[in-house]
Amino acid sequence: MATWQQGINSGGFLAGIGAQNENAPKARDINATLGLIRENNDLARSGANNVALTGLRGLAGVADIYNQEQQQKALNAFNQVHANAWATGDPSGLFKFAQENPAFVAQAQQAFSGLNEQQRNDMGDLAMKANVALSQGPEAYSKFITDNKDRLNRVGANPDWMIQTGVQNPEQLSHMLTTMSLGALGPEKAFAVQDKMVGREIDRGRLAETIRSNKAGEGLQARGQNITMRGQDMSAATARRGQDLATQRANARTISGSEGNRVVQLADGRTVSVGGKLHGAGANAFYEGIDDNGNMVRVPASAIAAPPTSAASAQNYAMKKDIDAIANADASALDFMTGMTGGAGNPAIGADVRSRLTGKEQRQLYNSAQRIQGRMQNQGVAAARDMGASGINTIAEAKMYFQGMPQVDYSSPEAMQQSIREIQEYTNNYNQQYNVNVGNGGLKSPRQQPDTQQSAGGSYTSKSGIKFTVE
């Protein structure tokens, strides 16, 4: 615990307490205040009382009281309670001490008996409020001193000295302010002022949290509307692709004159003759057919390739470009959109604004991350349909499906790049499910060719619009 050594006999209040209290401020610490009091000639000529000087003179007899053994014990106990309150940030122990030691409080109040009620209220109110601001950190304390500069000057306190002491010896200054507020106001009023001030800070925090929550809700609602619109667009596109496939199947050539049998191309480039009846449903739906080697096979409906569209090709190229941009970026270039307020799918607060201020590269990285997140949400919509859902119509449904998808992690640059690599791996695995290897589905034909002759390279697009390449 920091200790104080009495320097000179300056100021009744601090001299009285400082001689016995190792935690009290040094008397010389208020020389600037007393100098300001002596220079306040206008107030002296007008006959107005200088509040701080009057209060300090009225405390001159406190030292004699503190010399008593019983009062010394109370003072030591007060020092310990204050040290605990400062260390924990919980002032409840001080209030309890004041209730259990009324004699100590009464002696502190005697020091202010020479002031009228208004003067005591002003000094005590300023002391307690300054103490609360001091506990909230240097920025809050400096703002309080600046905002109340005139009030402090009126009671003879030098704002510059207050700021300097608050920076150099905050715990010791808090000790002095606590003692002054107890003496000027009494414990009930002093801690009522504290609770009211802290309560306002809590209310401000709650208001800010409400505003953030409302903004988040509005953003989520807008995102949900966008998801619904994208889902409707995808439904229309899926319907068009279905019509195209139906037309292709209707025009497919038949084999051996068998009605209903047709030749289709698999995602791995081979052709298979399949029957017209679809067995099963959803992801397990399949056709029965015969490959070119005479093998009886079951062909998953999802393995039948559709011709790639220019839109799908462009999207997949853009996805790869965005993933490479973030994965290969320097970690320091991602600081602007990551941090404590960032999370899964949500960039750090203010990332959009910072990306506009920090340069072209940061803006491109921010847009790349947003596009990747949007495409992963689109894949969530596709996955929902694969599970049999007709679409995503509510925010709750969207959150449920998106939780199962990899998302961009904005908590730190390293976490962001790792999540991008996981998204790339997920996309690759998602595409691989369409590279169907029919395998040994039946008896081998003598016409069987080596595996190297069975596979054909090329690019194809799945029913969900995902492009993949067979090498």
From Swiss-Prot:
Residues 436-471 are annotated as: Disordered. Interacts with the internal virion protein gp7; this interaction forms a tube-like structure that may allow DNA ejection through the host membranes. GO terms for biological process: symbiont genome ejection through host cell envelope, short tail mechanism. The gene is 20. Residues 446-464 have a biased composition (Polar residues). GO terms for cellular component: virion component. Coiled coil: none annotated. Inner capsid protein that plays a role in viral DNA ejection into the host cell. Ejected from the capsid after penetration the host outer membrane and has been released. Assembles into a structure that extends the extracellular trans-envelope channel formed by the internal virion protein gp7 and probably gp16. This channel allows the delivery of the viral genome into the cell cytoplasm. Keywords: Late protein, Viral genome ejection through host cell envelope, Viral penetration into host cytoplasm, Virion, Virus entry into host cell. This is Internal virion protein gp20. It is found in: Virion. It comes from Salmonella phage P22. Its main location: virion. InterPro entries: Inj_translocase. The keyword Transmembrane helix does not apply. It comes from the Viruses.
